[in-house]
Amino acid sequence: MNITKMKLFYVILFFISSLQISNSIDFNYPSAFNFGDSNSDTGDLVAGLGIRLDLPNGQNSFKTSSQRFCDGRLVIDFLMDEMDLPFLNPYLDSLGLPNFKKGCNFAAAGSTILPANPTSVSPFSFDLQISQFIRFKSRAIELLSKTGRKYEKYLPPIDYYSKGLYMIDIGQNDIAGAFYSKTLDQVLASIPSILETFEAGLKRLYEEGGRNIWIHNTGPLGCLAQNIAKFGTDSTKLDEFGCVSSHNQAAKLFNLQLHAMSNKFQAQYPDANVTYVDIFSIKSNLIANYSRFGKHFTKPLIDLNHLENVGYNKILNVLGFEKPLMACCGVGGAPLNYDSRITCGQTKVLDGISVTAKACNDSSEYINWDGIHYTEAANEFVSSQILTGKYSDPPFSDQMPFFLTLKF
């Protein structure tokens, strides 16, 4: 941090007592079970396919590859931390003596709601992930019943399945992937069938005892460098923020129908607790107002609109993100620093020249990590906004004050 930023940062600290601090929920889940794609994959695809995911992935928080498609922690990592739960071990990773006592992660990068096909990045579709969970639960209960206390340290007790939290963040690959072979109208027409499959999966989880369900909607897909590079070469197809309009239109319709389905499911199963979380609005707000949000205003649940109202908008602009769409790790330079032929950390010969997709100097200035996934700094911001409860339906009940802590 340079001298100017340091001075302005301490001005914020001096006046911190004047800020309005949001309240946070007192989470009391003994366990968590997660389903999804790369947004929350903590190593399942890497273990399942036997592939490598090297540095600079994981360079910030783990100092080594964490098997996450990110420079550090994901949204789910921050949420687990707030719930006083450990980071979730991936279901398919058997090395390192994984502990599943407080939950398990079934999410795998590239996964879809619809069944996988021969061209899918991941074979672990939503339905298959649920089947893995059912086997996990059955096998864990069997081991605990047969071996007594031998596995108590590593496997969930039976009541953790009914009391635990079931988190789901999947669907972006169904929508974004469809644009490679379908028109916008065809993509929009396919959404009901996608959600029918999703609803069937929810019912399977309910039948297995899942009662506390979080459903994250999909983010602004048109703002990912991968989609801009492929579908945004015609500037007339971009919105005011430089995002592909068609992709965001599809994401909005998907989310609208997903929200309606979530409400219907809640009505059908009144003993369930279904929470719909509007990730699209959080990420869209971040991209549209990137200079107002940054690495020093993520963990604290500060009402950032209040900061601006009391005259600190200039300080926010200095401390905020600097690159809303450009990838930190990639090749090609501005405006996107993305080339679909090479992924973050790889070295390849492109157009007769050997190039390496390297990370930027300071990933905390970027929202996008590799053209597809978000940086740790952006993920921390997203998780902090989730925890305000303002983006959930129903909103989190305010049960306890959130004690302000600042990370340097």
From Swiss-Prot:
Pfam short name (any one): Lipase_GDSL
EC number, as in UniProt: 3.1.1.-
GO terms for MF: hydrolase activity, acting on ester bonds
Keywords, comma-separated and alphabetical: Glycoprotein, Hydrolase, Lipid degradation, Lipid metabolism, Secreted, Signal
GO biological process: lipid catabolic process
Membership in a protein family: Belongs to the 'GDSL' lipolytic enzyme family.
Official protein name in the record: GDSL esterase/lipase At1g54790
Source organism of the structure: Arabidopsis thaliana (Mouse-ear cress)
